């Protein structure tokens, strides 16, 4: 594509407003051209030059739209992505990819048969702390990792009236927060041999999962993934123990908060995390503890890679095949919790 990639965005809820619209608009070589929304006033307040249409079908039928982005309620991902692909569009779907594994596999097969790029927005691969940790492991600083613990905890004791907290398909934090942690674990360590998962509704009036605790078992490693909506005290984001040392990091990547506050890209200081981690290494008989600077996060890298993939200059940053692995663990985790059992991957 020699001209700008023209992007159509479906919906203008939290994910579109906070992540996708500013990241798309801030990527050279891409144009946020059309947004499908029932609230034109809300869209125009942020993006006065963007065309607003009332229904997604107008994006599917627009021959000038190259890429359709779908950050809508989880149970709509499959039908919208399928319709967009069948209309000949390239597609980005927010996480979780779909509600079921079979839906994810069907979309992947459809995209391949049509020669379309299908990508899933697992943006937390570009978190500041995750990039720091990924670098540590690549350099072998911690040695062989035996224990990895990752938390995504919040304090929201009141159940809110929104689709993510209602009891419909794809609701709850096992579908909302856990995909981030599962994707990061797979990126670092690959698929586990087995997993043991506890899912619960702990808040009064909860209609969907608001607590999860997952143990991913590898031959010589345990990965603990934890999320709750009832954590007033701060938990460590990462606790990692290896044969040569440990890494502990508190705090959450700052990019979402900055985007939520309306900051636009590009910015020279983008992604800087002011909270550093602690690296502990054993040298001989001595234990050495040092502050480890956190590298900048880089959410803009996702849409830059999408641009390059559509132009034939690079790889899809998160192909559907990788998101399918996350869906495998989501479904296996639900079965594990249902049967209160450790289950092996097929």
Swiss-Prot record:
The keyword Translocase does not apply. GO terms for biological process: antibiotic biosynthetic process. GO terms for cellular component: cytosol. It is an enzyme of class 1 (oxidoreductase). Keywords: Oxidoreductase. GO terms for molecular function: nucleotide binding; scyllo-inositol dehydrogenase (NADP+) activity. It holds the Pfam family GFO_IDH_MocA_C. Its EC number is 1.-.-.-. The keyword Oxidoreductase applies. It comes from the Bacteria. InterPro entries: Gfo/Idh/MocA-like_OxRdtase_C, Gfo/Idh/MocA-like_OxRdtase_N, Gfo/Idh/MocA_oxidoreduct, NAD(P)-bd_dom_sf. Belongs to the Gfo/Idh/MocA family. This is Uncharacterized oxidoreductase YdgJ. It comes from Escherichia coli (strain K12).
